[in-house]
C-alpha cells in the first residue's frame, strides 16, 4: 500500500545553517612563560618611558584642542570648521595623534590612498576589534565620527573628541537614531563642506575572525563609501578587546610592554552604490561588506550587537555567555522575531538547561522539563530540535525548533482538538485518569506517572483540568504542541491505514516522516542561506 498523504506537514523554512565562525566575540589571550618574562623585562624599561612621552604629548594636545573648540557649543556644532581652526585640526592635531600612538609603540603601515571628501563622503572601517582602532581615524585625517553625547563630558578626551565635530547620539532621545542618520546624510551631501564621516559599521568589537552584520545607518545617504581595512599582524595579540576576553587595562599594559606593535591601515577604492543600492541601504551595506571580506579573506556572519546583549543575558541566567549567540540578524529576519522575543526564549531555555554546565539540553533534561519519560515519541520530538544530530540542543536550535515546529502548531484549532481528545467522556473537563490514559497510548508507555504534569496544568488544584487551564498551559509551553499535532496526525493515519494498524508503529511512522521532511527542508534550502 502506498504511503498515505500526510495531513499536517512541517512549514517550509529557509535553512539556518551554523555560521562559519561560531563566536566572534571571544578572545583567549594565552601568554607563555617566555611571553610573560619578555613583557616583564621590557615593561620595566618601556612603560615608564612611554608614560612620560605620552604625558608630554597630551600636555601639548590639550591647549591646542582648547583653542580649536573655543567658543563652540558643547551640544555640537551646526557648521564645519574653517580657516585656522581647520588647519589646527587637520594638520596639528593629526600630527600629535600620530605622535601619541608612536609613543605607545605602534608602527603604522598605510596602504592605498584615502579618497577626498567629494569622492567618498563616508569611510567605513572594519573589522572593529579594539579601542586602538582609533589609529584609523588618525590616518584618515581626523574625520568626524559618531559618538555618544555623554562622551563629550569626559575629562581631557572629551575635549579631543569635540575637535572632530562628531555626529552625536543620545541614549535619552527616542528620536536619536533617526536624527543621527539625518545628520550623517546632511554632512555626506554637503558637497565637501563638512569633513568625511568615519563609521565602524559593525557597531561592536569582534576578534577579527569574520565580518559581522553591518549596520545600515552609514549607508542610508546612498553616497560613495570608502572601505578602510585594519589589521594587526603581530605574533602576540594584545589589542583585541571583545566581550569575552581580557579587560582594557590589561590589554593597554601588555601593549605598552611590547617592543613594537604593527598595525596596517588599507584604503580600498570607493564603492559607488547602484540605483538599487541607493534605495536599499541593506544591499549597499552587504555589498561593501563583501568587498572588504574578500580583501581580508574572511567569512561573513549575521551576528550583531544584539548577540552581545544575549550573551550578557545568558551570563545573568547562569548559562555560558556563548550560549546566547544565535546570529541575531539571520534569526530575526527569517523567523520574524524581535530581540525581546528571543530574550524570552532564552529565559525558557535557561529553565531547561539550568542543570547543564555546557549550556546545552540533553534528552534527559528535555524529558525532565516536560515531566514525561524518555519514550520513542519524545526522542523523535527531541530529534526535530537537534538540527545537527549531536545529541544535544543548543539555544540556537531551541529558538528555531520552538518557532518553526511548535508555535505554528500551537493555535486555537489544535488546542481545541487536543482538549477534545483528552476529554474522553465529553464533560468539558479532563480528569487525571483521562489525561494519563491518552498519554500512555500516545507515548507508548504502559506505566506512566503524570501526576506532577497534571498538577501543573490544574492551576486551581480542583482535580480536573478545564479548557481555560489547558489552553493557558499550552500557550505558555509550546514545546508540547508538536506532541499534540503528531498525535492528531496519528489518529488520521490510523484511519487511512485501517483499524488493524499497530498504534506504536503508526506513531513512529508519523514522527519519522516529520523528521525526514524537516531534514530534507534544511538540506534543500542551503542555497538560500
UniProtKB/Swiss-Prot annotation:
EF-hand domain ranges (all copies): 373-408, 410-445, 449-480
Source species, domain of life: Eukaryota
UniProt-listed SUPFAM superfamilies: EF-hand (SSF47473), Glycerol-3-phosphate (1)-acyltransferase (SSF69593)
Residues annotated for Ca(2+) 1 binding in this entry: 386, 388, 390, 392, 397
The protein's Enzyme Commission number: 2.3.1.23, 2.3.1.51, 2.3.1.25, 2.3.1.67
Keyword Phosphoprotein in annotation: no
Residues of this chain annotated as glycosylated in UniProt: 207
Binding site for Ca(2+) 3: 458, 460, 462, 464, 469
UniProt GO BP: phospholipid biosynthetic process
Segments carrying motif HXXXXD motif: 128-133
Sequence motif: EGTC motif, positions: 202-205
Keywords: Acyltransferase, Calcium, Cell membrane, Endoplasmic reticulum, Glycoprotein, Golgi apparatus, Lipid biosynthesis, Lipid droplet, Lipid metabolism, Membrane, Metal-binding, Phospholipid biosynthesis, Phospholipid metabolism, Repeat, Signal-anchor, Transferase, Transmembrane, Transmembrane helix
Cross-referenced PROSITE patterns: EF_HAND_1, EF_HAND_2
Residues exposed to the Cytoplasmic side: 1-50
Class in the EC hierarchy, top level: transferase
Single annotated GO MF: lysophosphatidic acid acyltransferase activity
Pathway: Lipid metabolism; phospholipid metabolism
Ranges in the topological domain labelled Lumenal: 72-529
Gene Ontology CC: endoplasmic reticulum; endoplasmic reticulum membrane; Golgi membrane; lipid droplet; plasma membrane
Protein topology in the membrane: Single-pass type II membrane protein
Domain notes: The HXXXXD motif is essential for acyltransferase activity.
Cited function: Exhibits both acyltransferase and acetyltransferase activities. Activity is calcium-dependent. Catalyzes the conversion of lysophosphatidylcholine (1-acyl-sn-glycero-3-phosphocholine or LPC) into phosphatidylcholine (1,2-diacyl-sn-glycero-3-phosphocholine or PC). Catalyzes the conversion 1-acyl-sn-glycerol-3-phosphate (lysophosphatidic acid or LPA) into 1,2-diacyl-sn-glycerol-3-phosphate (phosphatidic acid or PA) by incorporating an acyl moiety at the sn-2 position of the glycerol backbone.
The protein, known as: Lysophosphatidylcholine acyltransferase 2
Organism: Danio rerio
